[in-house]
Amino acid sequence: MEAFVTDSQMDGGGIIRAVMSFSGGMDSTSLLLRLIKEGYKIDCISFNYGQKHNIEIERASLNISYLRKKGYTIEHKIVDLTSAMSIFHSSLITDEMTVPEGHYEEGQMKSTVVPNRNAIFSSIIYGYALSIVAKEGVNVKIALGVHSGDHAIYPDCRPDFYQSLDESFKLGNWDSERIDFYLPYILSLIHI
């Protein structure tokens, strides 16, 4: 796979940047590859929120390392939210509950919802994107691998959630016109 830049990624002579929430899982890894293919300069943010499956962060780091060895320049930062999110109730982060196994059903998987997780992650990557705008004067996409198949279980994977979040971010920040959500796996359901 070769990295390339198209005219649509150019912003006054510079490359449009992307900041993405990168778990290292299947959805975010496929999104990272898509962004590479589309020619974006990418900053990946992985979150340690006290999740029981620390393999995600290990996979994220391994995936980035592999891509760097292939010649791709990708920034990768790991943000530690364990203290803040330790007060939340979810089977993914508390020892008081077990993570359900087996078929991916709403009733069974509801315990895996981490309250407000995608809003928190989006806020952090949005703030980071605003910092890039201020330093570099470029447009930035903030990307998440959320997809429409998750919305039945995870309310923060719904198109209307991201539309509302985008409106709130634009109201609450200067330079927000330079930032857009990039959500290709729910893109057909939403226009932000």
Indicate residue ranges for each PLM-predicted region:
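ATP-dependent adenylation/nucleotidyltransferase module used to activate substrates
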Residues: 2-190
